[in-house]
Amino acid sequence: MLRWLRGFVLPTAACQGAEPPTRYETLFQALDRNGDGVVDIRELQEGLKSLGIPLGQDAEEKIFTTGDVNKDGKLDFEEFMKYLKDHEKKMKLAFKSLDKNNDGKIEASEIVQSLQTLGLTISEQQAELILQSIDADGTMTVDWNEWRDYFLFNPVADIEEIIRFWKHSTGIDIGDSLTIPDEFTEEERKSGQWWRQLLAGGIAGAVSRTSTAPLDRLKVMMQVHGSKSMNIFGGFRQMIKEGGVRSLWRGNGTNVIKIAPETAVKFWVYEQYKKLLTEEGQKIGTFERFISGSMAGATAQTFIYPMEVMKTRLAVGKTGQYSGIYDCAKKILKYEGFGAFYKGYVPNLLGIIPYAGIDLAVYELLKSHWLDNFAKDSVNPGVLVLLGCGALSSTCGQLASYPLALVRTRMQAQAMLEGAPQLNMVGLFRRIISKEGLPGLYRGITPNFMKVLPAVGISYVVYENMKQTLGVTQK
């Protein structure tokens, strides 16, 4: 179909100069099915589908947002031609940015190199699979004509947008703070897109955490009290009986407030650690990204850890025990001293390595599997695949680090339990295993897993809508 498109609508001579209007007119007439001189979105959808032209996600809506100058919901020929010409200029710039050796062709090695600039590492074999989805003549290289034909109606703006699909970031927030920070391109930094994306992610995290707060508090209660008899329904009944429905959100305020300082610190120190681990001009690899991200997570956790302790104390506390965050901090300082704000800090720090490492490794494994087996017609995996990979990799990371998270939570709260010995990390591990067995180290993991799917869905929807509101993406 791409060969037909090149021969019938976009001849090879087009790469040498401006396209004759009659060529655009031929395509316009093919799309204008009722012959009324304009193309509406339904005609565009049906026409492009019947022509077999590759489309990006929500491509038709984006084309109309950009091309429909008078906002009448239809494209006349002048608007149609102007959109294609403007879009082709952007695609020419994208092609040149990929064509590193300026030979007029894109090769697999150049795709690998360009992906690395976005912090995404793939093999040469995987790059060849991507190349095959664009290559129309089987030469295993992509020239300008093939490139233009493939992205003719795919309304991406530049090469970074084209290959950004597999960045390990989709606005997912499942309530954990140990993930490796996002990578931002130079253009995103200069344009200010980076802080808008961080803000969108922060708002999405706040909404997601608030929506799943009852499950999070239940998890904390099961971790701290460690009772085999406390199941999910019994736990909810007990919390509602003790403090009413509002008590299900106890501790959520602190959990939301800490998003902003933690994100800011993690992002800033991540950039500093990357500079320390890589030479100037060198692109960061997966290993350096893992080390930098883990160190950034540890630094951010050190900075906001007192809020983690207060979140646990508020969640476990009884009605009337604390009037709010300030009252909780004041009582901890008065009765236990400043050191109490860092109880459980060591297991929390140790949990960062297995969580971040396994999260990143599983995501890379899933990405490689998809590229090897399914990247035949498009490099874009789609929203469901991205969300699924992100959720699954985070879940695997949680499984590995959960025992450390449980011990951390108990150390944070053990001063509140009457008659409970004040044990260190090793002592708590021994006590849990001797009294509850190995399953005791995973107490509360069921509600933790139950919140993953709603958290992923809510945070993604809010994140995408906030990006539109903040001007990161077009509506």
From Swiss-Prot:
Annotated positions of the N6-acetyllysine modification: 318, 334, 435
Binding site for Ca(2+) 1: 32, 34, 36, 38, 43
Mitochondrial matrix-facing ranges: 216-250, 308-343, 405-443
Region annotation (Linker region) ranges: 159-168
Lineage top rank: taxon: Eukaryota
Record topological domains on the Mitochondrial intermembrane side: 1-197, 271-293, 364-386, 464-475
GO molecular function, one term: adenine nucleotide transmembrane transporter activity
Keywords: Acetylation, Antiport, Calcium, Membrane, Metal-binding, Mitochondrion, Mitochondrion inner membrane, Peroxisome, Repeat, Transmembrane, Transmembrane helix, Transport
Sequence positions that bind Ca(2+) 3: 99, 101, 103, 105, 110
Tissue: Mainly expressed in colon. Also expressed in the small intestine proximal to the ileum. Weakly expressed in kidney but not in the liver.
Residue sites binding Ca(2+) 4 per the record: 135, 137, 139, 141, 146
Residues that, per the record, bind Ca(2+) 2: 68, 70, 72, 74, 79
Coiled-coil ranges (or none): none
UniProt note on regulation of activity: Activated by an increase in cytosolic calcium levels that induce a conformational change of the N-terminal regulatory domain, uncapping the channel and allowing transport. Inhibited by bathophenanthroline, mersalyl, p-hydroxymercuribenzoate, bromcresol purple and tannic acid.
Protein family: Belongs to the mitochondrial carrier (TC 2.A.29) family.
Quaternary state and interactors: Monomer.
Protein name: Mitochondrial adenyl nucleotide antiporter SLC25A24
Species of the source: Oryctolagus cuniculus
Upper taxonomic lineage: Eukaryota, Metazoa, Chordata, Craniata, Vertebrata
